[in-house]
Amino acid sequence: MNTTTYVRPGEGRHYPMIDGDHIAKAAVHDTGGAFEVFEVIAPAKPMAPPHVSPWAGVLFLLEGQITALVDGTSYDVEPGGLVVVPAGTPATFAVVGESARLLAITSGDGAGRFFADFAGSVPVDQPAEDSMAAILAVTGRHGVALAGG
């Protein structure tokens, strides 16, 4: 069944993660396939290790500046810039400056489940190195892998 979805500014389910707050805005499932839409509000932090996910993603920068690292190539992205990350491609990003706000669109319906599991399993108030066992458990459950790992 096709239905219209309207989400007001500030609405959505929040998934606090080590690289920022991932806010689920919409999940669409119809005869043409599935995709999910997230707003990501990311603070300046060290770049997380590149990771590989089973879904493709589009990162559209709304505010701030990021450096996206996709398959070994670095992209300096400014507001209005867009990076497409194919499924199975190592990728990560770092905020340049104080913070950034992105619109992320992912193929399929797995990213939301991954974000929910990660947010519920990995503490955001400690360094990623200290949570590596939890991170690896969550990534393993969702077909996500650290690049080179």
Describe the role of every protein-language-model region.
Residues E98-A134:
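A contiguous, mid-protein "functional segment" used to position or interact
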Residues R8-P9, Q65, G72-P90:
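Short acidic-glycine-tyrosine-enriched beta hairpin
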Residues M1-A34, D125-G149:
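A short, N-terminal "cap"/entry segment at the start of jelly-roll beta-barrel domains
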Residues V37-P43, V52-V70, I105:
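Short, conserved beta-strand element in jelly-roll/cupin
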Residues H22, P46-A48, G64-L69, V83:
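Short beta-strand segments in beta-sandwich/barrel cores
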Residues T31, T67, A87-G112:
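Ligand-binding loop in jelly-roll beta-barrel domains
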Residues P9, H22-K25, F38-S53:
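Conserved short histidine dyad/triad with adjacent acidic residue
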